[in-house]
Design a protein with these regions (language model features):
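Pyridoxal 5′-phosphate
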Residues: 1-358
Length: 358
């Protein structure tokens, strides 16, 4: 079976992740800080998932009557949480849109800022298009207006070199089991220096109001921490650029072939190399579910049809009726698997243009 749904999880883990020796939280913080180029490991807070990390971050920093800019690239879970904060605490939300290529509308940001604007909430990488946000540009705008930038990094952690100090992100939320190739059940928050006290103070009334959220901050099992540490050590062993470039090359190869097929429309910004290894397509005459069924049943290829938990992004792209078919590549995929996937798509369309496989 060929697994091309790495945007959701990594099927194959590095040797040593499963069965790793237990690790301490301090060891895991040190490695996390090193991976994300943070000076102080104590600014890392572990949770049990990326979604928990985002929830704790928003609840800690966004309060009653605040206004936030929330990108349409962010997943439905983040939007649902923001809408809950709006309904219960009067938080105001302004959607931050994208253009036809899925690129964030940076020029609109300053005109949307209000006196009560607290934060710009924006995913670092898009799970639909594979686009990566220009965080240096976004955080420069935020700094001019003294706003926080809270970013869901679940698609970029382990998929590119995330240098938090250079990017200027205030609050970076991540998961360990997607591109970082660690075990399920671990995520976290990386805070800019000076924000830890504010984060803790912001959580006090939140945990009093909803004690169940305290479970998100319960210590992570040392065995899971061990697997997580082993995954990061694997990234260091291979080199972050080596880990990132292989999937990127595979995705580029898939894109170059599919864009030559008249019946296939590819979504996203492919005019830059600053991307994650995700390619989403629409195939004329077939629904995403039909494309997926063909890939899986005839060729054993796992891709992902539908809205990918990002319905607002699909609305912005004009693909909300059926969604798209997403192919997301990982470190353990091969060129042969990409060729097989291209061939499977050619078979679906009745093509025999072998140059597409050259």
């Amino acid at each position: 079976m060929t697994f091309l749904n790495n945007a959701a999880k990594t099927q194959q883990k590095p040797e040593g992740v499963r069965g790793a020796a237990p690790a301490t939280e301090a060891q895991a913080k040190e490695l996390t800080a090193k991976l994300f180029h943070m000076k102080n490991p104590e600014n890392v807070v572990f949770t049990h998932s990326g979604s928990q990390a985002v929830e704790l971050a928003l609840r800690a920093f966004v309060k009653k009557g605040d206004h936030i800019l929330l990108s349409v690239m962010d997943v439905d879970a983040t939007w649902e949480l923001a809408e809950e904060l709006a309904a219960v605490h009067g938080v105001e939300i302004s959607p931050l849109g994208v253009n036809v290529y899925g690129i964030l509308d940076y020029d609109a940001i300053e005109g949307m800022i209000r006196p009560n604007t607290r934060a710009i909430v924006c995913a670092h990488g898009c799970s639909v298009t594979g686009n990566i946000v220009n965080m240096e540009r976004l955080t420069a705008i935020a700094r001019r207006h003294k706003l926080l930038v809270i970013s869901d990094g679940c698609q970029t952690a382990g998929a590119c070199d995330v240098h938090l100090e250079e990017l200027g992100i205030d609050v970076y939320c991540f998961t360990g089991y997607k591109k970082m190739m660690g075990p399920r059940g671990i995520g976290g928050i990386c805070l800019k220096e000076g924000l830890m006290d504010q984060f803790r103070e912001g959580l006090v009334p939140v945990l009093e109001e909803n004690p169940k959220l305290a479970a998100a901050l319960a210590p992570v099992d040392p065995v899971k921490l061990g697997g997580y540490c082993a995954a990061i050590e694997f990234i260091f062993e291979k080199g972050i650029y080596g880990i990132c470039m292989l999937p990127h090359r595979l995705a580029k190869r898939f894109f170059e072939s599919t864009k030559s097929m008249d019946a296939v429309e590819v979504y996203g910004d492919f005019g830059t190399n600053t991307r994650i290894a995700t390619v989403s397509i629409r195939v004329e005459g077939f629904t995403p579910e039909q494309v997926h069924a063909h890939m899986l049943e005839k060729y054993g290829i796992v891709c992902k049809p539908g809205l990918h938990g990002s319905s607002r992004m699909h609305e912005a792209l004009g693909t909300s009726q059926n969604g798209l078919t997403r192919f997301s590549f990982g470190y353990f995929n091969t060129r042969m698997e990409v060729n097989d996937t291209i061939w499977a798509l050619m078979d679906l369309l009745g093509l025999d243009d072998l140059y597409l496989l050259a």
